[in-house]
Amino acid sequence: MRTLAIDIGGTKIALAIVEEGTIIQRYQIATPVVQDVTKFVQAILEKVTEWLPSIDYVGVSTTGYVTPEGITSINPETLNFPVPFPLAQTLEQLTNKPVSILNDAQAAAWFEFVQLKNPSLNMAFITVSTGVGGGIIIDGKLHKGNSGLAGHIGHMSVAIEGPLCGCGQRGCVESMASGNAIQKESEATFTETMSNVELFKQAAFNPKAEAIINRSVQAVATLCCNLKACLDLDIIVLGGGIGLAEGYLERLNKAIQSRPSVFHIPVTPAHGDYDACLLGAAFQFKE
């Protein structure tokens, strides 16, 4: 079985042919800045037209809130789709293939759960990337909730007087810990423009850079402890460009260990590395 996996993020879209859990071919494009769903899908498919005859299924993981009607952007600053955005329906029409779609972190959570050596564990996947998202596995099942909203843990508030999030709340984890949040804080702190990659390099000898990263880490640590308190999870798996940046996981586990022991929970790196969401898109067809 070959699946065309499509992972839609705020800045880029990753595409791959996945067979038996292995990426056979891959391609990456910038996320199209178009509001028309047909043009959006065409911009994706034109890069991989030659793949389609060999594909059995299309699996999509996407930032945003996925409902049967389409995709809704909870935080338009991360990805601003018209509401609802009927991506899956349009993909089915243009590819004539079965299409399944999940929120990206929910998809990654399922992929990471399948990789666990102990399938009895209750777990969460957290991605710290352009935004912050999550997926929750309880009793061996992906918990999506009645409407599909479950797992949007980046919009749990960890600072009631914190910065205004694009979703409309204050102090969301996403508004304090995401790549976008780190970039905003960096721009407010330094006179020269600095990428997040450079910020992490600077942190070893620049206290201001370290403080910006630590702000993100502390917000995610609070989120992890809250998930432990709320769901009594066994493990958390961390992914995303920020979450997998050098030194971030070590900082995070140290921050969690500084909290009361009843809220401690182990955090491990994603088995799928930076491709957890992409592989999760394909693994929707593995029940």
From Swiss-Prot:
The UniProt record lists the EC number as: 2.7.1.60
- The residues forming a coiled coil are none
Can you name one GO molecular function term for this protein? ATP binding
What are the entry keywords?
ATP-binding, Carbohydrate metabolism, Kinase, Metal-binding, Nucleotide-binding, Transferase, Zinc
Q: Its annotated pathway?
A: Amino-sugar metabolism; N-acetylneuraminate degradation; D-fructose 6-phosphate from N-acetylneuraminate: step 2/5
Pfam families recorded: ROK (PF00480)
* Binding site residues for ATP: 5-12, 131-138
Q: Which superkingdom, per the lineage?
A: Bacteria
Query: One of this protein's GO BP terms?
Result: N-acetylneuraminate catabolic process
Where Zn(2+) binds, per the record, is at 155, 165, 167, 172
What is this enzyme's catalytic activity, as reactions? an N-acyl-D-mannosamine + ATP = an N-acyl-D-mannosamine 6-phosphate + ADP + H(+)
InterPro entries per UniProt: ATPase_NBD, ManNAc_kinase_bac, ROK, ROK_cs
Top EC class per UniProt?
A: transferase
Quaternary structure annotation from Swiss-Prot or TrEMBL: Homodimer.
Q: What does this protein do?
A: Catalyzes the phosphorylation of N-acetylmannosamine (ManNAc) to ManNAc-6-P.
Give the family this protein belongs to, as stated in its UniProt record.
Belongs to the ROK (NagC/XylR) family. NanK subfamily.
- Under which name does UniProt file this protein? N-acetylmannosamine kinase
Task: Recall the taxonomic lineage recorded for the source organism.
Answer: Bacteria, Pseudomonadati, Pseudomonadota, Gammaproteobacteria, Vibrionales
